[in-house]
A protein has these predicted regions:
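Signature of uroporphyrinogen-III synthase
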Residues: 1-241
């Protein structure tokens, strides 16, 4: 059985995809999101940086943002949503945070000077990838953070999930974010389930997430070749063969 830890809406979509491929899965959503700002005010002459689907979805709800707003985005799905909504000034779509840093270093600095932009407005959740944020601030470009949402995390496993782990029914656990990986490990320690989880194969969306698990003593860990759900499902097929 595969344990899905994504927020409920995304978890249901993934469960449906896995069911179609013949996989049995169980949902335990480690987190849920809550929008903080009802009205989004984007700073004039700043480049908007969107690094998650959730931030992109909230950004797209605003009716007061120009379709010519300069945008940098991480993730092909987010880019597609922006394109469909009519935003035609996407400066770059990166596959992950490292690729985005590469674009900023090699190309955005020149664009920033030519277009006379005032800085980068990083639209994100309350919790962010601190390593990425640190790298983002190392260039001579002002960076302003705008928090669009916050994540609420579960404080314990529910009874069904705990029993599935204790009975070693869970064979694979998928983790899509560093925050969820840390929360999963926290709950495992709290419930004293470390030994039961040693047999679980952890499949993650990135090397950074895998590193968190390996640092906690778990060695049955792999990450998708590309940071997207399609690549993760392809990797899953190799694991459960």
């Amino acid at each position: 059985m595969i344990l899905i830890t994504r927020p409920l809406k995304e978890a249901r979509i993934l469960k449906s995809l896995l069911t179609d491929k013949g996989y049995n899965s169980h949902i335990f959503s480690l987190s849920s999101s809550m929008q903080i700002q009802s009205t989004i005010k984007i700073k004039k002459n700043y480049v908007t940086l969107l690094t998650s689907m959730r931030a992109t979805e909230i950004f797209l709800k605003s009716k007061y943002i120009s379709k010519r707003q300069p945008i940098m985005v991480i993730g092909a799905k987010s880019f597609k949503q922006l394109h469909t909504a009519g935003f035609n000034n996407v400066l770059h779509c990166a596959k992950d945070s490292n690729a985005m840093i590469g674009f900023i270093e090699k190309k955005l600095i020149d664009i920033y000077k030519k277009k006379n932009y005032k800085g980068i407005e990083y639209c994100s959740g309350y919790q962010i990838n601190q390593n990425f944020f640190k790298k983002l601030k190392q260039y001579n470009i002002p960076v302003k953070r705008t928090v669009l949402y916050k994540m609420n995390f579960k404080k314990s496993f529910n009874t069904i999930t705990k029993k599935l782990i204790e009975k070693n029914t869970i064979k694979v656990c998928v983790l899509y974010s560093q925050q969820n990986a840390n929360k999963f490990l926290e709950l495992v320690k709290k419930e004293k389930l470390e030994n039961h989880c040693k047999s679980i194969f952890f499949l993650t969306l990135s090397k950074d997430i895998s590193t968190i698990l390996k640092a906690s003593g778990f060695d049955k860990v792999k990450n998708a070749r590309q940071p997207n759900q399609g690549s993760l499902i392809n990797m899953l097929a190799k694991i459960v063969m």
